[in-house]
């Protein structure tokens, strides 16, 4: 399997990286199949050979996470949602759903309480009318 990954070079504590296509079993700094670009994390300088990268991606090469981020910034591939982001968003969605259920439950309880209160008021009004009428008829 061909991977698109970074090959380190430069001085100690002043690392720069070359974006290379290489076999997934080869060493990090081993001989690459093709050099595709350059990345300096200190200055954020990035140079990409877009045609060669598109060709390698078309052949089925898999970019590493860091290279994927560089390619997304360069506009060569679409931004993808990674599993860690999905988990966080899933937790947030579950929390929102739970809050919505709780709010719906509270609204249903409030509605039921209002209906019960209205029914009690209607019964009280009937009860006031009925005993008065019964007492008058029993007295008269």
Swiss-Prot record:
Gene3D superfamilies: 3.30.1320.10. GO terms for cellular component: cytoplasm; small ribosomal subunit. One of its GO terms (biological process) is translation. InterPro entries: Ribosomal_bS16, Ribosomal_bS16_CS, Ribosomal_bS16_dom_sf. One of its GO terms (molecular function) is structural constituent of ribosome. Residues 94-114 have a biased composition (Basic and acidic residues). Residues 115-124 have a biased composition (Low complexity). Residues 130-140 have a biased composition (Acidic residues). Keywords: Ribonucleoprotein, Ribosomal protein. Residues 86-140 are annotated as: Disordered. PROSITE patterns: RIBOSOMAL_S16 (PS00732). The keyword Ribosomal protein applies. NCBIfam families: S16. Belongs to the bacterial ribosomal protein bS16 family. This is Small ribosomal subunit protein bS16. The gene is rpsP.
């Amino acid at each position: 399997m061909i991977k698109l990954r970074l090959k380190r070079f430069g001085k100690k504590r002043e690392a720069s990286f070359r974006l290379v296509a290489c076999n997934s079993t080869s060493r990090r700094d081993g001989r690459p199949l093709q050099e595709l670009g350059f990345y300096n994390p200190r200055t954020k300088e990035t140079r990409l050979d877009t045609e060669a990268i598109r060709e390698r991606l078309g052949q089925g090469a898999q970019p590493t996470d860091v290279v994927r981020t560089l390619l997304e910034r360069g506009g060569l591939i679409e931004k993808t949602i990674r599993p860690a982001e999905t988990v966080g968003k899933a937790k947030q969605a579950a929390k929102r759903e739970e809050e919505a259920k709780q709010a719906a439950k509270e609204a249903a309880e409030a509605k039921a309480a209002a209906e019960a209160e209205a029914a009690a008021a209607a019964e009280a009004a009937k009860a006031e009318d009925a005993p008065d009428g019964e007492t008058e008829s029993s007295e008269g």
